[in-house]
Design a protein with these regions (language model features):
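Short, well-structured N-terminal submotif of metal-dependent ribonuclease cores
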Residues: 1-36, 45-58, 125
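Alpha-helix capping/helix-boundary segments
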Residues: 9-10, 40, 69, 89-90, ...
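Short beta-strand scaffold positions
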Residues: 36, 64, 85, 103-104
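Phosphate- and divalent-cation-binding pockets in alpha/beta enzyme and binding domains
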Residues: 43, 72, 111-112
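Acidic catalytic patch
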Residues: 60-80, 92, 106
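Acidic, metal-associated active-site segment
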Residues: 84-100
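Acidic, PIN/NYN-like endoribonuclease modules and their adjacent C-terminal/linker elements
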Residues: 95-125
Length: 125
């Protein structure tokens, strides 16, 4: 089983968080390619000078955001009474992939996860 990274994980990687990098390396060495989403990349990418971020992303699969997913994400936001489209897309992507989520903000993603089937597990940094 792989994992989906949220923006907090990418920010930590960009800042050189050794624990995040070590965890990422272990996953890759085990043949598990982590996922993140294009909206998450857009949320954290600010400059081509973010070399650590770009290096980290080379070891990730980046899921797009389709119009069909947009309807599912919108329905999830309505059910959960939340408004963060990026977090909702992370949760929706994880559920679709049968994955769990690694996040720096477990409260928001746990609230979303409770409205998804199949359920996803939310892990905190």
């Amino acid at each position: 089983m792989t994992i989906v990274y949220d923006g907090g994980v990418l920010i930590a990687a960009d800042r050189g968080d050794r624990r995040v990098w070590a965890d990422h390396r272990v996953r890759l060495e085990a043949g598990l390619v982590p996922l993140t989403t294009a909206p998450v990349v857009a949320q954290v990418s600010r400059s081509p000078r973010q070399v650590p971020l770009r290096r980290f992303l080379r070891g990730c699969e980046i899921a797009g955001f389709t119009s069909d997913q947009g309807h599912g994400v919108g329905a999830l936001l309505a059910k959960s009474r939340t408004s963060d489209v990026v977090d909702a897309h992370v949760a929706f992507t994880a559920a679709g992939a049968g994955s769990s989520v690694l996040t720096s903000d477990p409260a928001d993603l746990t609230a979303l996860a409770s409205h998804l089937r199949p359920r996803i597990v939310v892990h905190s940094l």
